[in-house]
C-alpha cells in the first residue's frame, strides 16, 4: 500500500511530514537536522558526536533527571544520534502521550542546556567508546581504510571524532555548533503512527512555528556542498598490527558515488549481487561458503551528499589474510571480465523489491525512510516508484556500474589484526 504521506513546509522553513498508521496506538517521532560531523570545526573533531550525547541531558526548563522521569513514566523513549551530514532526535510513545513527547523533542532541539557537568560526563563516555574502538580490529581496519582512501578530503575525518578533538571541546563550542546547525530551515519533523495527519501538522506548527530562522536564510533549506574526492590511481596496502588479537579484519574498496548520481540504483543492484548481505552474493558464495576462509564477508555502498566509500569487509584468521585479499581480487577481476549472470541480477532485483515492504513494517522504519526521501529530494512517491526503478535495471547496467567503480589495481586495502604486511619486493 502506498505511503502517501502529508508534507508541508512552515513559514520559517521547518518541513513537516506526517503518515497516519492506526494499526497500534503508538507514534514514532523523528526530528532530522541537516548538520553533523561534516560541520565539526577542524580542531574539534567529535563536536557533533558530543553534542548528540549532551543534547537530551537537560533543557533550559527541564533537568536531565526530569526528562528521564517524564519518559519513564510514560513508557516512552527519546534518543539523539549524529551522522556525517545529519543529526536526529528519535522518540516513540503511546498516542495519548504524543503532545507531551513532541513538546519534549522540540524542547531538546531548540533549548538544550549544555551543562558543564553533563558535558564532562558525556565527554568521558565518548572517549571510552573511542578507546574501545581502538582495541577492535574491525574498527581499526575501517579507520585505516578511510584515511588512506580519502587523504586530506573531509571524509577522512571520523564521525565520532578523535580523543584529542573531544578533549578540546568546551561548552561554547557546543553552543556555537547548535546555534549554527539547528536552524529551522535545517529541520524536518516526521511523525508516523496513530495520529491524524492534519493534527500532526498543527501540533508541529505550534511547537516549531515560532522558531525564527537565522538572518540570511530567508526560510530556504541549507545545501550541503561536498567537494569531489580524488580516486586513488594505484593500489595501496595498509597494515595495522594488533598481535594480541585472534582475528584479522580486512577493509577493501574504492571512492564511491553521491546519492544524487544517476547510476545509484544500478550501483545498488550491483552491490546486492556482489555480496551486500554477507550470506549469498558472489563474495559470500566464494570466500565464505566454498573456500571457508572468512567468518564474514560483505560489500557496502555508502552514497550520501558526497562520494562515500564502496567497501568490501571480511573477518578472517591471520593465516588467511593474503588468500582472502587474493580471492577478492580474483572475484572482482572475473566480474569485470565476464560480468554478472542474468540469474544473479534477477535474483538481486527480486530480493530488493521484495524487501521493501519488510523495511517499512514499523512506524520508526517508515519515519527513517521518509527522512531519507526528504533529505535527498527523492519525492514523496518514492516508495511507489522504487520497485520500478529496481526492476528496470539490467545485467548490462549492473556490469557497467561494476566497471565504473571496481578496479583491483586501484584498490585501497587495510588489514588490522595479528598480521604484518609482507615487505615490498
Segments the model singles out, each with a brief description of its role:
Residues 45-57:
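Active-site SXXK
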Residues 1-42, 57-99, 120, 129-186, ...:
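Non-catalytic beta-strand/loop surface segments
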Residues 107-114, 206-215, 330-339:
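A common structural junction motif
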Residues 51, 101, 105, 109, ...:
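Short alpha-helical scaffolding segments that buttress acidic/His motifs in well-ordered protein cores
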Amino acid at each position: 500500500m502506498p505511503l502517501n504521506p502529508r508534507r508541508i513546509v512552515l513559514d520559517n522553513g521547518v518541513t513537516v511530514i506526517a503518515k497516519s498508521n492506526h494499526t497500534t496506538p503508538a507514534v514514532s517521532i523523528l526530528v532530522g537536522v541537516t548538520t553533523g560531523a561534516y560541520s565539526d570545526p577542524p580542531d574539534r573533531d567529535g563536536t557533533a558526536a558530543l553534542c548528540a550525547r549532551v543534547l537530551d541531558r537537560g533543557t533550559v526548563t527541564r533537568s536531565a533527571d526530569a526528562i528521564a522521569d517524564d519518559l519513564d513514566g510514560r513508557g516512552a523513549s527519546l534518543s539523539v544520534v549524529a551522522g556525517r551530514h545529519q543529526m536526529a532526535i528519535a522518540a516513540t510513545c503511546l498516542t495519548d502521550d504524543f503532545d507531551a513527547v513532541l513538546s519534549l523533542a522540540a524542547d531538546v532541539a531548540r533549548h538544550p542546556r549544555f551543562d558543564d557537568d553533563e558535558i564532562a560526563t558525556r565527554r568521558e563516555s565518548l572517549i571510552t567508546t573511542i578507546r574501545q574502538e581502538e582495541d577492535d580490529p574491525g574498527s581499526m581496519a575501517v579507520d585505516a581504510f578511510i584515511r588512506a582512501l580519502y587523504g586530506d578530503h573531509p571524509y577522512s575525518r571520523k564521525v565520532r571524532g578523535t580523543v584529542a578533538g573531544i578533549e578540546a571541546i568546551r561548552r561554547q563550542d557546543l553552543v556555537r555548533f547548535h546555534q549554527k546547525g539547528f536552524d529551522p530551515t535545517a529541520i524536518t519533523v516526521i511523525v508516523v503512527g496513530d495520529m491524524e495527519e492534519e493534527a500532526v501538522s498543527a501540533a508541529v506548527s505550534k511547537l516549531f512555528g515560532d522558531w525564527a530562522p537565522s538572518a540570511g536564510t530567508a526560510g530556504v533549506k541549507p545545501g550541503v556542498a561536498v567537494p569531489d574526492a580524488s580516486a586513488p590511481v594505484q593500489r595501496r596496502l595498509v597494515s595495522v598490527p594488533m598481535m594480541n588479537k585472534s582475528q584479522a579484519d580486512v577493509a577493501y574498496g574504492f571512492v564511491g558515488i553521491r546519492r544524487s548520481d544517476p547510476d545509484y540504483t544500478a550501483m545498488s543492484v550491483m552491490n546486492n549481487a556482489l555480496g551486500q548481505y554477507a550470506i549469498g552474493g558472489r563474495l559470500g558464495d566464494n570466500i565464505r561458503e566454498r573456500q571457508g576462509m572468512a567468518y564474514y564477508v560483505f560489500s557496502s555502498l555508502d552514497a550520501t551528499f558526497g562520494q562515500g566509500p564502496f567497501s568490501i569487509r571480511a573477518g578472517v584468521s591471520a593465516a588467511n589474510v593474503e588468500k582472502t585479499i587474493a580471492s577478492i581480487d580474483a572475484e572482482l577481476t572475473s566480474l569485470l571480465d565476464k560480468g554478472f549472470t542474468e540469474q544473479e541480477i534477477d535474483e538481486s532485483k527480486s530480493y530488493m523489491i521484495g524487501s521493501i515492504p519488510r523495511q517499512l513494517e514499523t512506524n520508526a522504519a517508515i519515519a527513517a525512510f521518509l527522512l531519507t526521501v526528504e533529505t535527498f529530494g527523492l519525492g514523496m512517491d518514492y516508495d511507489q516508484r522504487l520497485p520500478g526503478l529496481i526492476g528496470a535495471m539490467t545485467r548490462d547496467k549492473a556490469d557497467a556500474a561494476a566497471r565504473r567503480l571496481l578496479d583491483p589495481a586501484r584498490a585501497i586495502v587495510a588489514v588490522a589484526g595479528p598480521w604484518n604486511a609482507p615487505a615490498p619486493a
